[in-house]
Amino acid sequence: MIALVDYGGGNLKSVANAIHALGYEFKLTSSPEEILSAEAVILPGVGAAADTMAGLQSKGLDKAIKELVARDIPLLAICVGMQVLFDYTAEGDNTKCLGILKGDVKRLPEGLKIPQMGWNQLKQRVSHPIFEGIPDGIDFYFVHSYYASPADPGIIGATTDYGVDFCSLVISKRLIATQFHPEKSGSYGLKLYQNFFKMALGDKK
């Protein structure tokens, strides 16, 4: 089962449409038990990190997400879903986050149009199955004002330049996290979802 985490926010409809377009079944859930019994989990994200953390904590989903990563259950985290995996974010009043990944989340540099909203290039830093069939340098769709700064550069799977060369994709064991929105990124965004599901589920749908 694929679990799509419902914490009271996030880009649920477009993510759900992307999953359906690929022919996969999923369950929209806010149950920690269902999330921990899933074969793959998607943590979507739109909006403020503090609101996301409050939504997760109110349903006990913060602990469930920490546990699923500890169990090495495949997780795909998107946009704010990626940011809250780190220790804290500069958004708001240095909001404390999940601390699954070491590092913090910084604001994009002043002097640029913020938020970054639109297409930007993904520069692949490693060879990995998540990039299968996706040429290096393809544009993906971004909407964000903050970016993750991992303490361990070894988890940086791709970077993007917007005044600063920032981490736009994380790979850590079976955890994949993207600053961009694959569900809004056309055929290559769908391909990234497909690659994640293939890594998690094999040929099963």
Curated annotation (Swiss-Prot):
The Glutamine amidotransferase type-1 domain, residue ranges: 1-205
Catalytic activity: 5-[(5-phospho-1-deoxy-D-ribulos-1-ylimino)methylamino]-1-(5-phospho-beta-D-ribosyl)imidazole-4-carboxamide + L-glutamine = D-erythro-1-(imidazol-4-yl)glycerol 3-phosphate + 5-amino-1-(5-phospho-beta-D-ribosyl)imidazole-4-carboxamide + L-glutamate + H(+); L-glutamine + H2O = L-glutamate + NH4(+)
GO MF terms held by the record: glutaminase activity; imidazoleglycerol-phosphate synthase activity; lyase activity
Cross-referenced Gene3D superfamilies: 3.40.50.880
InterPro entries named among the record's database cross-references: Class_I_gatase-like, GATASE, Imidazole-glycPsynth_HisH
Sorted UniProt keywords: Amino-acid biosynthesis, Cytoplasm, Glutamine amidotransferase, Histidine biosynthesis, Hydrolase, Lyase
UniProt subcellular location: Cytoplasm
UniProt keyword annotation of NADP present: no
Residues forming the catalytic site: 79, 181, 183
GO cellular component, one term: cytoplasm
Keyword presence, Amino-acid biosynthesis: yes
Origin superkingdom: Bacteria
Functional pathway: Amino-acid biosynthesis; L-histidine biosynthesis; L-histidine from 5-phospho-alpha-D-ribose 1-diphosphate: step 5/9
Biological process, per Gene Ontology: L-histidine biosynthetic process
EC annotation from Swiss-Prot or TrEMBL: 4.3.2.10, 3.5.1.2
PANTHER family reported in the protein's UniProt record: IMIDAZOLE GLYCEROL PHOSPHATE SYNTHASE SUBUNIT HISH (PTHR42701:SF1)
Protein task: IGPS catalyzes the conversion of PRFAR and glutamine to IGP, AICAR and glutamate. The HisH subunit catalyzes the hydrolysis of glutamine to glutamate and ammonia as part of the synthesis of IGP and AICAR. The resulting ammonia molecule is channeled to the active site of HisF.
Subunit structure as annotated in this protein's UniProt entry: Heterodimer of HisH and HisF.
Protein name in the entry: Imidazole glycerol phosphate synthase subunit HisH
Organism (species): Dehalococcoides mccartyi (strain ATCC BAA-2266 / KCTC 15142 / 195)
